[in-house]
């Protein structure tokens, strides 16, 4: 009954193809490239943020990842797939064998197209997800940042942050708890231990509560080993939680603060830059204090001089003690983790991520 509706007669006598045929053809072209075409549970890869130029970001990502991927794992090899015979004379008369061979050739060609790095739809603007096969994303990204940190050589213009994603699951609290119980074991289960922090970011998702996610993940880490402690200054491990739509991306990274929150634009900057910035801010602070002291001496009011210092410290970027009051009411290390997640989300927004 549906076949006549798909092809309708036009005034010129021709036939118009139904929409279903175009949809199937488009879907077939996507599947022909091999592998998933969008971010989904069960993938490993690298989440990359950029600034309004995703196509250029993908090009830079391929170039950078292939360069360091070949250095760590060697170049990709497809000789086995390319040298497979295209036909067999002895099996031409056997229909069943010919069918099996055709299916095998299709599978082989699909596997050949599954490259080491493949861009997929992330589900968010200014975010690119590169699916990886046969490598460990956290080691590769750490190797890239370590080299850029040492050489101070800038290799990208569009890429902002590059976060390895070791696992993905559904972005529902129960699914995340179940997945994290086994995912976090290699780093935090006894006898393994370490200091940690949790960095949380959510995009295009409104059904997951930040404080609940951080509280549950922190509880899992402490349950795996009671000696795991929170350190927001220089943690040994940073648990990265990136939620996009209905997919939760997880990873555990090292040197998160040393490598400037895995920001490729910041990690190549000389250490002199922040010190100079702090010195400039300090000079401004001293100038303000001097002017305040002079005004206080003229007005003979000593109380105003004591109130000037907290205002300047807030201008230098320190957090206010009264922020996030709901999280502060909760005990233990969880309020610290929640405040860290707040700082992490703000920094991500500043990076156009």
UniProtKB/Swiss-Prot annotation:
List of residues that carry Phosphoserine: 86, 88, 119, 270
PROSITE patterns: THUMP (PS51165)
Span of domain THUMP: 147-254
Pathology linked to this chain's protein: Neurodevelopmental disorder with speech delay and variable ocular anomalies: An autosomal recessive disorder characterized by global developmental delay, speech delay, moderate to severe intellectual deficiency, behavioral abnormalities such as angry outbursts, facial dysmorphism, and ophthalmological abnormalities. Brain imaging is usually normal, but abnormalities of the corpus callosum have been reported.
Domain of life: Eukaryota
SUPFAM superfamilies documented for this protein: THUMP domain-like
InterPro entries (alphabetical): THUMP_dom, THUMPD1-like
UniProt-listed GO biological process terms: tRNA modification
Name of the protein in its database record: THUMP domain-containing protein 1
Keyword Methyltransferase attached: no
């Amino acid at each position: 009954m549906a076949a006549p509706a798909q092809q309708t007669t036009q005034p010129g006598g021709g036939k118009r193809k139904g929409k279903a045929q175009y949809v199937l053809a488009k879907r077939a072209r996507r599947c022909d490239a091999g592998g998933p075409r969008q971010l989904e549970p069960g993938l490993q890869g690298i989440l990359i943020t950029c600034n309004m130029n995703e196509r250029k970001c993908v090009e830079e990502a391929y170039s950078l990842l292939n360069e360091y991927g070949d250095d760590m794992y060697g170049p990709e090899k497809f000789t086995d797939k390319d040298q497979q015979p295209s036909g067999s004379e002895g099996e031409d008369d056997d229909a069943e064998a010919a069918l099996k061979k055709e299916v095998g050739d299709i599978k082989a060609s699909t596997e050949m197209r599954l490259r080491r790095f493949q861009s997929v739809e992330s589900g968010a603007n200014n975010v690119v997800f590169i699916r990886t096969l046969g490598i460990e994303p956290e080691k590769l990204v750490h190797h890239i940042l370590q080299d850029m940190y040492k050489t101070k050589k800038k290799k990208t213009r569009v890429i902002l942050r590059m976060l390895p994603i070791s696992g993905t699951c559904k972005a529902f609290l129960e699914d995340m708890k179940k997945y994290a119980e086994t995912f976090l074991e290699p780093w935090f289960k006894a006898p393994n231990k370490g200091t940690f922090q949790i960095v949380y970011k959510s995009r295009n998702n409104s059904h997951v509560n930040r404080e609940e996610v951080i509280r549950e993940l922190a509880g899992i880490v402490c349950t795996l080993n009671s000696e795991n402690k929170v350190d927001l200054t220089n943690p040994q491990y940073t648990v990265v939680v990136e939620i996009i739509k209905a997919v939760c991306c997880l990873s555990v990274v090292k040197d998160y603060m040393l490598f400037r929150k895995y920001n490729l634009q910041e990690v190549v900057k000389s250490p002199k830059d922040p010190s100079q910035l702090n010195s400039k801010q300090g000079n401004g602070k001293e100038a303000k204090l001097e002017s305040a002291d002079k005004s206080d001496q003229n007005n003979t009011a000593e109380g105003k001089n004591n109130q000037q210092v907290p205002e300047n410290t807030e201008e230098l970027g320190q957090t206010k003690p009264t922020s996030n009051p709901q999280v502060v009411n909760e005990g233990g290390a969880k309020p610290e983790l929640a405040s860290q997640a707040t700082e992490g989300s703000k920094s991500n927004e500043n990076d156009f991520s």
